[in-house]
Amino acid sequence: MSDRQQVTNAKGERIAIVAGLRTPFAKQATAFHGVSALDMGKMVVNELLARSELDPKLIEQLVYGQVVQMPAAPNIAREIVLGTGMNVSTDAYSVTRACATSFQSAVNVAESIMTGNIEIGIAGGADSSSVLPIGVSKKLAHALVDLNKARSFGQKLQIFRRLGIKDLLPVPPAVAEYSTGLSMGQTAEQMAKTYNISRADQDALAHRSHTLASETWASGHLRDEVMVAHVPPYKQFIDRDNNIRENSVLESYAKLRPAFDKQHGTVTAANSTPLTDGASAIILMSEGRAKALGYQPIGYIKSYAFSAIDVWQDMLMGPSYATPLALKRAGMELEDLTLIEMHEAFAAQTLANMQMFASKKFAEEKLGRNRAIGEIDMSKFNVLGGSLAYGHPFAATGTRLITQVCRELKRRGGGTGLTTACAAGGLGVAMILEVE
């Protein structure tokens, strides 16, 4: 059996990425304060359809994701269909795979095209860290259920008497792993210590990311892939990411205190991604359908792979497990790639993965390979800056990476690009894109 992955339909047509778009990414409680993930999702899909001059009625499937779920709209994909002029019969469902969510939505739509069930679909994701589902304590939740069954005033009073003041306090969404109690930042700190990644190296990577992102915006390269977002009450707009440190100065990073290990830590707010609001989406078609409609695809999906590892140690090492799978399925080696784009959740996590890419010992002991994945050529790596600068709305990052890599490869005259990300739960993803 061949190891090669056939990302084509029954006619042998490739899966085309016709267009991609995102909102600007904004730090928590800034430009998108009060704007839900659903509203941002509708905003970007509407604009993507308008810019592409694609009739919404032609969309056969929409798969969309959200990590921080809103109880009022649990199926964000269906609500986007109803809010963007598509047929009410359009197939729509929601997915979640932590920070790899919109990679998952893209793969789901691609596989629907591969099987011949559809020819045109939209994939993406959105998250808001400003509009959050604030919960209640377990004791209060239990009491509220009991209140529904209470008949008399006395019964209701007895239920309330079981509650203390602390039981009435709101409960924000969890930031830790359910199974371990560890946060992403604590895991990044563990990886920094395990792999001897210095504070100086983390700060240097963050500085590089912000500098390149600032230069990329100044060059105008992102104007066609980032929309102008007008937000209620429509007296202002946001047209660029607001986390990027313009005129970044490396020395200033050293001033920040460690965020997760106050005494001996090296992970800080400056070398980590901030809580971010934003949305992104891509249009996928069969190659033949794209040609028939007159579209020039920005890229094609060549291969993809997901991985899962233990959550107690090195939980954010997903790229080092998923990448060799995607490369093998594409019949490629790391050195064959034109560009390499790795999601920078934390500088420590990124540097640890880069270290493992180059490690023969890791390849032999963890991957069952007789050679390392490969040393990363920094002239190919995150050439426009990364998530440390742009920010990270959890479900939106995947399709941001896909669009950004395809468009940058197009500017360079074509080639192949790797997009890869870690995700909560010990998950990882890698996707190889090709551009003509």
Swiss-Prot record:
Write the Enzyme Commission number(s) for this entry.
2.3.1.16
Cellular component, GO annotation:
cytosol
Keywords, alphabetical? Acyltransferase, Cytoplasm, Fatty acid metabolism, Lipid degradation, Lipid metabolism, Transferase
- SUPFAM superfamilies per UniProt: Thiolase-like (SSF53901)
Name of protein? 3-ketoacyl-CoA thiolase
Species of the source = Shewanella baltica (strain OS185)
Please write the reaction equations for the catalytic activity of this protein: an acyl-CoA + acetyl-CoA = a 3-oxoacyl-CoA + CoA
Subcellular location, record wording: Cytoplasm
Recorded hits in Pfam families, A to Z, give: Thiolase_C, Thiolase_N
Q: Which gene encodes it?
A: fadI
The protein's role, per its UniProt record: Catalyzes the final step of fatty acid oxidation in which acetyl-CoA is released and the CoA ester of a fatty acid two carbons shorter is formed.
Biological classification of the source: Bacteria, Pseudomonadati, Pseudomonadota, Gammaproteobacteria, Alteromonadales
- Catalytic residues per the record? 99, 392, 422
What family, per the record? Belongs to the thiolase-like superfamily. Thiolase family.
Subunit architecture? Heterotetramer of two alpha chains (FadJ) and two beta chains (FadI).
Q: What is its main location?
A: cytoplasm
Q: Please give the pathway this protein is involved in.
A: Lipid metabolism; fatty acid beta-oxidation
What would you give as a GO molecular function for this chain, any one?
A: acetyl-CoA C-acyltransferase activity
**One GO-annotated biological process of the protein:** fatty acid beta-oxidation
Q: Which InterPro entries match?
A: 3-ketoacyl-CoA_Thiolase, Ac-CoA_C-AcTrfase_FadI, Thiolase, Thiolase-like, Thiolase_AS, Thiolase_C, Thiolase_CS, Thiolase_N
